[in-house]
Amino acid sequence: MSKMESTQQMASSIINTSFEAAVVAATSTLELMGIQYDYNEVYTRVKSKFDYVMDDSGVKNNLLGKAATYDQALNGKFGSAARNRNWMADTRTTARLDEDVNKLRMMLSSKGIDQKMRVLNACFNVKRVPGKSSSIIKCTRLMRDKIERGEVEVDDSFVEEKMEVDTIDWKSRYEQLEKRFESLKQRVNEKYTSWVQKAKKVNENMYSLQNVISQQQSQIADLQNYCNKLEVDLQNKISSLVSSVEWYLKSMELPDEIKTDIEQQLNSIDVINPINAIDDFESLIRNIILDYDRIFLMFKGLMRQCNYEYTYE
């Protein structure tokens, strides 16, 4: 960039510096508020908004255009400067500026910023005093001009009204507030007491329920132990019964085939599960009764063939 474009360079630098200041202000505000943020995200969002506002409002092009006009004037080209001067002095330009000002005033009114607020903001500035809660109110040049033109008046009615406000009976106001506070305190205490009683009742019911559950669990454990003992006793009794029958079977004068068949049926009895063992005993007894019935029928038939009669005594 040549030396005679220094004004454009300075304007561009001011715009870039304004953007950096906006980023620093945003991040500093977030840090003071204790809000965690991503610097890259804040930078991107501020840049997007800043570029949009500067471009949409025409401020950037206006500044760079004026800077280019100054550079052309420094280079000895006064044509653009003369056109800008004539444009600024033209009645149509003045009318457009008045129209823009009126639009801005109506826009401020629509946002709730009325004439009183606009005038007060234009007449006064507030200067903060470092290290103090108070501040200094400074009058602007507009306020000084209004005083010189006699456009500033003192409203005596406001002073009298202010004096009446200062004579408020603060003692009675304090007593009223104290009564309201005591009433509110009493209601809060009543609610708190009610909540405490409900909480105690809930705790008592919970402890009572826990005791009932504990007793039931103890009874269930006792019943379980009793059932386990009964099951063990039945298993031992069944095992002893099977052994006793096997020993008794061996002392009989039955054929070996019959003994083997009965022993197999005895060995098939489920000694571990008493329910299955009872079913096995039932099957064994049915088989024995069936064999006895068949033997009796054979004996009965043999007696008839031999012309013998039989009787039960």
Swiss-Prot record:
GO terms for cellular component: host cell cytoplasm. Residues 150-206 are annotated as: Dimerization. Residues 166-237 form a coiled coil. It is found in: Host cytoplasm. Gene3D superfamilies: 3.30.70.1610, Nonstructural RNA-binding protein, Rotavirus non-structural protein NSP3, N-terminal domain. Residues 208-313 are annotated as: Interaction with host EIF4G1. Residues 1-149 are annotated as: RNA-binding. GO terms for biological process: regulation of translation. One of its GO terms (molecular function) is RNA binding. HAMAP family: ROTA_A_NSP3, ROTA_NSP3. Belongs to the rotavirus NSP3 family. Homodimer. Interacts (via the coiled-coil region) with host ZC3H7B (via LD motif). Interacts with host EIF4G1. This is Non-structural protein 3. It comes from Rotavirus A (strain RVA/Cow/United States/NCDV-Lincoln/1969/G6P6[1]) (RV-A).
